[in-house]
Amino acid sequence: MPPVTADRRQPLLVVGHGHRSAPPMQIVEAASGLCDLLWLIDESVPDGAFTSRLLRKVGTVLNIAGMTPREAVSSLQAYSPDGVVAYRDEDIVFLSLIAAELGLEYRTPEVARRLVDKLLQREALSNGGLSSPFCWEVPADRSPAVIESFAELVEYPAVLKPRIGNGGQYTMPVADAADLVRSVALLPTEAGGETGMFVEQYLPSLATERGERFGGYVSVESLVAGGEISHVAVTGRFPLAEPFRETGFFIPADLSEAQLAAVLEVATDALRALGVRTGDCHTEIKLTPDGPRVLEVNGRLGGGVPEMLLQASGVSLFGLSIRIALGEPVVVDGPIPCGGVGWRFLFQPPTSARRVVSIEGLDRLAALPGVNEIYVNRSPGDPIDWREGTRHYIYSVYGVSADYDELMEINRFLHEEVSIAYE
């Protein structure tokens, strides 16, 4: 697609893009017939220039390397964009500042910060009347003496995590004060970035009615237009790999009618407490003995969720998201009915592994009915580090099954028939 010109016939959507963004070709396909695309990308990061060259084939590209939001606005004004959208956490606040300057409908900078900073988010949820675990901010000084004193203030069991981050990166369970001191010592210097780390009380899990074969929490995909909230899909989980690494997701979640109603009510309350009036959100909710409790709210679509929903229902979540970003009053009577179970597995290495030696059996996995795509994320020879969280998975598998029993057979196969050796 040539650069956008003043006589364009379609609306123009600004899309933040970078490492771990949503697949660009899926966005291009969803935008077809709806709008032209203008990609914001930092060409100074690894692979940034290469990605920029590819994106120029499917839209206009603005290199924002070293730019402040105000400087980006100065460059964007010539294009007169009609909307902005972010599909990764790193772009949400930046785009909120741009949208505010350009007068475009998006999250306010205040709401955007609540959506990416988990400590600010906890405060807003609590102020909004939702039951939230107690939290403690880790001191910037992580010297042993300071952390030992801090650890005595925390109630256990608890979870150590970054204020800003995703995918379970640098997230660890802590059983007691000594465990917290050890866990903080394991953190690399960059963990937590400028905002730092915090500790929150651990929420106990309640198994779903199907039993322990599925994980004890779900996520809700929501679209918000003009303050109207539509819950489009509820995603189920397989049990986490230690300590908090995702292993598999599926749509629809296997919940009773009562559980589903309670989960959707909590998701609605959370979005209202955070002040979300537009855009898409991914709310993770744990099923506890005291009812559903919010783990976190992300101001974007969940990773892999659009692909799973498309396979299970034929509905394009990216398409709905783009229409909202362009100002359409989209309302969906959800959760959307599914004709099967769309799923994505992420095979996680053990915490003792440091490098991949070999992978065998993926060819046989690919031949199974319902398997649509396999992606190898860590090849033989690649280093791995469990502290990086979910993102250091070995391979992922997308597909669709007729029911949960077929889903479980895929799960059994990849754990028993695919062989991976590690150092």
List each language-model region with its residue ranges.
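Peripheral (often C-terminal) accessory segments that flank ATP-dependent C-N-forming ligase machineries
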Residues: 322-423
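Conserved ATP-binding module of the ATP-grasp superfamily
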Residues: 131-133, 153, 157-160, 173-212, ...
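Glycine-rich phosphate-binding loop signature in dinucleotide/nucleotide-binding domains
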Residues: 75-81, 152-154, 193
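Active-site "cap" helix and flanking loop/linker of ATP-utilizing ligase/carboxylase catalytic domains
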Residues: 7-9, 262-283, 289, 299-356
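A conserved helix-loop-beta module that forms one wall/lid of the active-site cleft
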Residues: 101-170
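Short beta-strand-to-turn element immediately C-terminal to the catalytic PLP-Schiff-base lysine
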Residues: 138, 171-176, 223-225
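ATP-binding N-terminal substructure of ATP-dependent carboxylate-amine bond-forming enzymes
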Residues: 1-111, 120, 127, 141, ...
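ATP-dependent carboxylate/phosphate-activation module, predominantly the ATP-grasp catalytic core
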Residues: 201-204, 210-276, 280, 298-320
